[in-house]
C-alpha cells in the first residue's frame, strides 16, 4: 500500500478515536492577522506547500487539517482510498456523494448536505455561462444556480475569523439558529504561516463536501511586498509595470498569482467551484493598493490576472467577482461582462435596512440582469425588506466576527436579528441548498 494511503487510513482511524473520546471542540490558532504568506509551491506538494507536512494532524472537529497529509486527486483519501466525492463522516466512515458529516470536516452540530432540499433553483436549460470558455461543469452549474435564484432568494454567508478560531464563526450560527450559512468565506492571506491551524483550501473543500458553497478573496501585499494585511494597503511603485513582462513588479505579481492558482487548482482537482473576489473593495478611498490607480490601470490588472490564472495556469473552477467598496460602484473600474461573472459591493453601514442605494448604484454599473452579491457586510440586511424590489441581493456575507460582537461601540448583529434573517423564507442556508455536485 502506498505510504500516502497508509497515512490517510491512520488519520481516519484517529478521527474515529478522537470523536469517540471527546465531544468538545478545541480552538484552533490560525496565527496573527499580520502573518506573512509564503508564495510557495502547489497545494499538492513540494517546497513551500501550505498543505504538506509530516505526521498528519486531525482538526478538533474530526476533519483533516492543513498540516496533515496532502490531499491527492481532489479527495481526502489519497492513493485510491476515495471518499466518492464526500467527506469523512462523524464516525470516521467515508460518506458518499457529498453527504454531510455530523461533527466532522466543518459539519459541526449536525449539519446536513440537503441534496435536493428546498431553496433550489432550476439549472436546466440554462442560458448563461461563465466568462471562462473552459469552465468546469461545477462552475457552470453554480453560475446557473445563482441566476436561477436571483431576485427570489438570498444566500446567507459568513467570513471566517482566520486569525483566531475559524470554526467558531460557523459554530455561532449553529448555536444561535441551528443552521449553517450557505457560504463559507475564506482568505488566501491566511493560508500559510508559522501558526497554521487550518488551510483555507482544505476548509473550503470540506464545506463544499458538507453541502455548502465557498467564496474566497486574497489580501495580496502590494508587489513586491510580502503578503500581510498592512502590505495590502501599501502602494506599487510603478502600477503600469505590473502587467509588463520582465519588470520586477510583474515578476512579483506573477509569483503571487502562482500561489493563488496552486490553491485554486487544488480545489479544481477536488471538483469544488469557487466564487473568487481577488481584488475586493475597489473604491475612491483607495484602502488597498489595487485602488491606488486609474480605472484603466485597474482594468488592465484585472484582465491580466483573469487571463493568467485561466489561460496560463489552467484554473477553470472560478466564477470571477468584481468587488466594489463602501462608497459605491465605479463605472470606470468595471472590466465589462466579458471579464466578470458577478459584480458586487461591500458595506459597513449600521442597521438592518436593505441598503437599496448601494444595490441600485451597483446595478447601474454591472447591468440589469447580472446577480449582485453583498459579498462583505457588517450587518445583515433583513430579507423581508429586501424583496421583492428594494434590493434583492444575491447574497450577504458577514465579515469575520461581526455576527455577534460590539465592535466599534455598537452591536453589529444581535441574536434576534440573526434569527429573524435566517428564519425568513427568502433565506437559503447550507441545509436548504440543492446538491450542486
PLM features: residue spans?
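Boundary/entry segment of secreted carbohydrate-active catalytic domains
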Residues: 124-176, 180-189
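Substrate-binding cleft of secreted/luminal carbohydrate-active enzymes
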Residues: 150-161, 370-437
Amino acid at each position: 500500500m502506498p505510504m500516502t494511503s497508509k497515512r490517510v487510513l491512520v488519520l481516519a482511524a484517529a478521527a474515529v478515536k478522537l470523536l469517540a473520546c471527546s465531544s468538545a471542540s478545541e480552538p484552533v490558532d490560525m496565527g496573527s492577522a499580520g502573518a506573512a504568506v509564503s508564495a510557495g509551491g502547489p497545494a499538492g506538494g513540494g517546497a513551500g506547500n501550505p498543505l504538506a507536512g509530516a505526521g498528519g494532524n486531525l482538526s478538533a472537529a474530526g476533519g483533516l487539517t492543513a498540516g496533515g497529509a496532502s490531499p491527492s486527486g481532489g479527495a481526502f483519501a489519497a492513493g485510491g482510498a476515495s471518499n466518492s466525492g464526500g467527506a469523512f463522516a462523524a464516525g470516521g466512515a467515508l460518506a458518499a456523494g457529498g453527504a454531510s458529516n455530523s461533527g466532522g470536516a466543518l459539519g459541526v452540530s449536525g449539519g446536513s448536505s440537503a441534496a435536493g432540499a428546498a431553496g433550489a433553483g432550476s439549472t436546466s436549460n440554462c442560458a448563461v455561462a461563465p466568462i471562462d470558455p473552459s469552465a468546469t461543469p461545477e462552475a457552470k452549474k453554480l453560475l446557473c444556480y445563482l441566476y436561477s435564484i436571483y431576485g427570489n432568494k438570498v444566500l446567507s454567508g459568513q467570513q471566517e475569523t482566520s486569525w483566531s478560531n475559524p470554526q467558531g464563526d460557523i459554530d455561532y450560527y449553529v448555536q444561535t439558529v441551528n443552521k449553517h450559512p450557505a457560504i463559507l468565506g475564506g482568505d488566501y492571506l491566511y493560508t500559510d504561516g508559522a501558526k497554521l491551524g487550518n488551510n483555507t483550501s482544505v476548509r473550503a473543500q470540506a464545506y463544499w463536501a458538507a453541502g455548502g458553497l465557498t467564496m474566497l478573496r486574497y489580501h495580496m501585499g502590494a508587489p513586491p511586498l510580502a503578503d500581510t494585511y498592512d502590505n495590502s494597503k501599501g502602494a506599487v511603485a510603478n502600477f503600469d509595470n505590473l502587467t509588463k513582462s520582465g519588470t520586477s513588479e510583474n515578476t512579483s505579481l506573477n509569483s503571487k498569482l502562482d500561489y493563488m492558482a496552486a490553491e485554486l487548482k487544488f480545489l479544481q482537482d477536488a471538483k469544488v467551484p469557487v466564487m473568487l473576489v481577488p481584488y475586493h473593495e475597489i473604491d475612491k478611498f483607495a484602502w488597498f493598493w489595487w485602488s491606488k490607480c486609474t480605472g484603466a490601470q485597474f482594468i488592465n490588472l484585472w484582465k491580466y490576472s483573469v487571463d493568467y490564472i485561466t489561460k496560463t495556469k489552467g484554473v477553470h473552477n472560478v466564477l470571477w467577482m468584481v468587488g466594489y467598496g463602501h462608497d459605491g460602484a465605479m463605472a470606470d473600474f468595471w472590466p465589462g461582462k466579458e471579464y466578470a461573472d458577478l459584480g458586487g459591493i461591500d458595506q459597513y453601514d449600521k442597521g438592518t435596512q436593505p441598503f437599496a442605494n448601494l444595490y441600485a448604484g451597483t446595478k447601474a454599473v454591472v447591468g440589469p440582469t447580472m446577480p449582485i452579491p453583498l459579498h462583505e457586510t457588517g450587518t445583515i440586511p433583513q430579507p423581508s425588506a429586501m424583496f421583492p424590489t428594494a434590493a434583492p441581493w444575491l447574497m450577504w456575507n458577514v465579515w469575520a466576527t461581526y455576527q455577534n460582537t460590539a465592535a466599534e461601540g455598537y452591536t453589529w448583529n444581535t441574536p434576534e436579528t440573526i434569527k429573524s434573517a435566517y428564519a425568513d423564507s427568502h433565506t437559503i442556508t447550507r441545509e436548504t441548498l440543492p446538491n450542486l455536485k
